[in-house]
Amino acid sequence: MTQAEKGDTENGKEKGGEKEKEQRGVKRPIVPALVPESLQEQIQSNFIIVIHPGSTTLRIGRATDTLPASIPHVIARRHKQQGQPLYKDSWLLREGLNKPESNEQRQNGLKMVDQAIWSKKMSNGTRRIPVSPEQARSYNKQMRPAILDHCSGNKWTNTSHHPECLVGEEALYVNPLDCYNIHWPIRRGQLNIHPGPGGSLTAVLADIEVIWSHAIQKYLEIPLKDLKYYRCILLIPDIYNKQHVKELVNMILMKMGFSGIVVHQESVCATYGSGLSSTCIVDVGDQKTSVCCVEDGVSHRNTRLCLAYGGSDVSRCFYWLMQRAGFPYRECQLTNKMDCLLLQHLKETFCHLDQDISGLQDHEFQIRHPDSPALLYQFRLGDEKLQAPMALFYPATFGIVGQKMTTLQHRSQGDPEDPHDEHYLLATQSKQEQSAKATADRKSASKPIGFEGDLRGQSSDLPERLHSQEVDLGSAQGDGLMAGNDSEEALTALMSRKTAISLFEGKALGPDKAILHSIDCCSSDDTKKKMYSSILVVGGGLMFHKAQEFLQHRILNKMPPSFRRIIENVDVITRPKDMDPRLIAWKGGAVLACLDTTQELWIYQREWQRFGVRMLRERAAFVW
């Protein structure tokens, strides 16, 4: 039989089979659209917008975009009445800098930095020769600016048409004399709630809605009326405020009008963006540094901690160090937006973590403020370029006094709209289980908790133990299951643990110590080994020359000897796949949009309208 005859026979069989199915009442399948599957996925992903809101920068784009649009996360709102006092959220300045102890703390931190610089030898085996600021000061004091052009080429934002609000670059370049308040709606990774003007939750959410809507219209060219055809993937911090997340989801679905949303954590998205399955994530942002361990798409709750400093603190510290060396631009002010932009630029241009770069070096920079001449300054710098980024590892150098510097994952305060929150689960626990846990609490309370040294050993699981102790004790007290003495003992134990936690959160850890603490909170040695073998640094706060080698050296020197013997290599990754580390988390959100499993995570507008925050508990890919 020839090939043609075989083909005809097979076709005949297929047609015969179809006739039999029709006779049995089986409907013929609908002919699929002649669109390749890959193109269908492309169309679907093209209608998903990924939003990664940062303290200083908003990154937003379609899931199919190669790169997101990055805009300053700031808004300028016009005064409603004439004569209204100006209000500006600070950028580089923060609370706790002008305390009586601040300067002494800065000096002590700088001594530790200098000692660390001197103790580490250069690659040729010799020690660095320290350069005192006096050596540069005499030269810098004599320098005067050269006028490059009588017009800088930059202009203030045109406000002659009296716009109600301005967003992003336009807000940054609003003339300080214009009647506009400046608001940064996110500070240190959380909503910027404060007692000043525009500091209420409602006002902050309104600012965010305006900024995001403007970005969608201008940079993605999507009319707001068409958002009902789009879905959103929102990236949130690992240590998040449930109330704030709930309000953001409500804003996106009910006010902006997206048809659906997936909420996921920055650290997990960073693993998707980098292609790593298990890693210790170190996210050094502009205002906060968060550390946690992620394993197979799960951020381990017990390993999360957030440090209340980042790249902007390095910029401010660099300015202080340059002032000691006679910084020639003497009109520089930390309250001036243009000067803040300049200091950020100088930090990114000159700072490094390379021990081999030493001695005095000549530099120059330009100032191009709006409606001012373009000026060229020349000056000399020595160790200041290395000292400033090293302040991240010795945060006392920032001079921040009386502020909470470390945040751990705490128990949720509960939500009246969520009937199955932790409080409900506690209230419905069996009394027998509660009594058993209360007995275990009393036994563990009798053991002293060490909280000295390098945060290893017994202290490593303190946050989780406190978390469970606090939960269990609260439920037992609520039901009156303990006798008087037992209750007093447990209450004393709880208070001592709360004191230990507050002491820990008052400490300013460097990223290296935070990494060690986070990994040490992992449940098993196998997991710890995996985390030491893969440390991923994302965000823009540690983008300094030789940062990878510097962090790797510090981790190797401080990790427990037991792991040092069995781990072949501590791999610190700062540019996975040669990508910009600032975009890794956003890119991971775009990858998440294309995964098949994401179909189960979508929360739709109608569902949210009917069930509210309960949908987050049901659909979130992390433990809500």
UniProtKB/Swiss-Prot annotation:
CDD domains: ASKHA_NBD_Arp8-like. ATP binds at residues 55-56, 283-286. SUPFAM superfamilies: Actin-like ATPase domain. The modification Phosphoserine is found at residues 132, 412. Residues 1-29, 430-462 are annotated as: Disordered. InterPro entries: Actin, ATPase_NBD. It holds the Pfam family Actin. GO terms for biological process: cell division; DNA recombination; DNA repair. GO terms for molecular function: ATP binding. The modification N-acetylmethionine is found at residue 1. It comes from the Eukaryota. Its main location: nucleus. GO terms for cellular component: chromosome; nucleus. Residues 1-25 have a biased composition (Basic and acidic residues). It is found in: Nucleus; Chromosome. Keywords: Acetylation, ATP-binding, Cell cycle, Cell division, Chromosome, DNA damage, DNA recombination, DNA repair, Mitosis, Nucleotide-binding, Nucleus, Phosphoprotein, Transcription, Transcription regulation. Disulfide bonds: none annotated. Component of the chromatin remodeling INO80 complex; specifically part of a complex module associated with the DBINO domain of INO80. Exists as monomers and dimers, but the dimer is most probably the biologically relevant form required for stable interactions with histones that exploits the twofold symmetry of the nucleosome core. Plays an important role in the functional organization of mitotic chromosomes. Exhibits low basal ATPase activity, and unable to polymerize. Proposed core component of the chromatin remodeling INO80 complex which is involved in transcriptional regulation, DNA replication and probably DNA repair. Required for the recruitment of INO80 (and probably the INO80 complex) to sites of DNA damage Strongly prefer nucleosomes and H3-H4 tetramers over H2A-H2B dimers, suggesting it may act as a nucleosome recognition module within the complex. Belongs to the actin family. ARP8 subfamily. This is Actin-related protein 8.
